[in-house]
Regions:
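Nonpolar helix-loop interface/hinge motif
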Residues: 1-55, 112-115, 161-244, 248, ...
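Low-complexity, intrinsically disordered extramembrane tails and loops of integral membrane proteins
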Residues: 1-11, 277-315
Length: 350
């Protein structure tokens, strides 16, 4: 791993942010991937074992459906899959995400951090991080119900849901780990940062979504297509399904190990960029000795909250409405293309 680049903070354009995130990712590839792999690989092995146990019992259930309540392999595999999913939420979404955020921030600010050092650096901040993510999940349910409220909900609900899940939620980890915010205050703080540059942040998120489609979703779809043909030669469909499940899980493992650190680096950098643009974070760092971690932590602490800041202003409602209408318009556009192709293709063939 190379030494971190000298600390030079300034407002960055979208392309510069992505370039900095990729450079940071490349310089610290082993560290960033290792932080995620330390907890994700063992859990994925358990997940593969659980899924294999459950899938291998499907042959028995297909021939004897009445044995579903006595097929302990099936229920054991299902229960263990649920347990592993719960452990992944704690260890990956909570602890590993917190450690990765700490490693990205430290290296971006000019401090070398090891894998174990990143885990030690988060302290107990993973607990409020988990709480905040659970609260985000509850809020997403509330926003989904708000979406079906006539008139105002119809035109703002989808936009609110999109912003919460794609922009505010990823910003929670830097806010909790780097600023020490609590469960509720971290979500409000993350929203406060996002709303300051609403459309540039969403544009940034959209570009990252395209990245994820290319790195994660794309290989998965290709693998599914290849496996569907290659494993069709198995006489035993259950064996083919088990092998397909294992290979798909391995592809998912590799994709996440490669992409998730890049995603967290990108969101941590836009967090810093928002603070540089709106709070003078870069100027504050120039006034202290950055070789002392205590000084950095002091500057990192969020400024006092603006007591008269409304949670949702009129301009925010307008942005939500525009986003909702844009999403609906894009959906209608693609559906029209698909339906048009379905109806026009037969006539063109004739």
């Amino acid at each position: 791993m190379e030494n971190p680049a000298p600390l030079t903070l300034r407002p960055l354009r979208l392309g510069e942010l992505l370039d900095q995130a990729i450079r940071l990712y490349r310089r610290n590839f082993i560290t960033f991937v290792g932080i995620v792999a330390m907890v994700y690989v063992p859990l994925m092995v358990l997940q593969i074992a659980s899924t294999t146990l459950m899938t291998s019992s499907l042959d028995t259930l297909t021939s004897s459906p009445e044995q579903i309540f006595t097929n302990y392999a099936y229920w054991g595999g299902m229960l263990s899959s649920l347990v592993v999913a719960f452990l992944q939420f704690i260890f990956v979404q909570g602890i590993a995400t917190g450690a990765l955020t700490r490693a990205v921030a430290d290296n971006y600010l000019g401090k070398t951090t090891s894998i174990l050092g990143a885990y030690r650096g988060i302290g107990k901040s993973w607990l409020p991080l988990l709480g905040a993510l659970l609260l985000v999940g509850l809020l997403s349910i509330v926003f989904a119900f708000w979406w079906i409220v006539p008139c105002i909900g119809w035109i703002t609900g989808l936009g609110m849901l999109v912003v919460l899940l794609t922009a505010v939620s990823p910003m929670v980890a830097p806010v909790v780990v780097l600023e020490g915010q609590g469960v509720i205050s971290s979500i409000r703080r993350a929203w406060s940062l996002v709303r300051r540059r609403f459309w540039p942040v969403l544009g940034y998120v959209f570009v990252l979504y395209i990245f994820s489609m290319l790195i994660v979703t794309g290989p998965g779809l290709i693998m599914n297509a290849v496996l569907a043909g290659a494993l069709g030669v198995f006489e035993d469909p259950t064996s083919g399904l088990v092998i397909r499940t294992i290979l798909q899980s391995l592809v998912q493992l590799i994709s996440i190990l490669l992409y998730y650190p890049l995603q967290m680096a990108a969101f941590t950098l836009i967090y810093f960029d928002l603070r540089v643009r709106t709070e003078g974070f870069d100027i504050a760092l120039l006034t202290v000795d950055v070789s002392d971690q205590a000084n950095i932590d002091q500057v990192m602490a969020a400024p006092a909250a603006v007591t008269n800041e409304r949670l949702i202003a009129g301009s925010d409602v307008g942005n939500f409405a525009i986003l909702t209408l844009a999403a609906v318009g894009i959906y209608i556009f693609f559906i029209s293309i698909i339906m048009g192709g379905v109806f026009l293709l037969p006539s063109l063939i004739r």
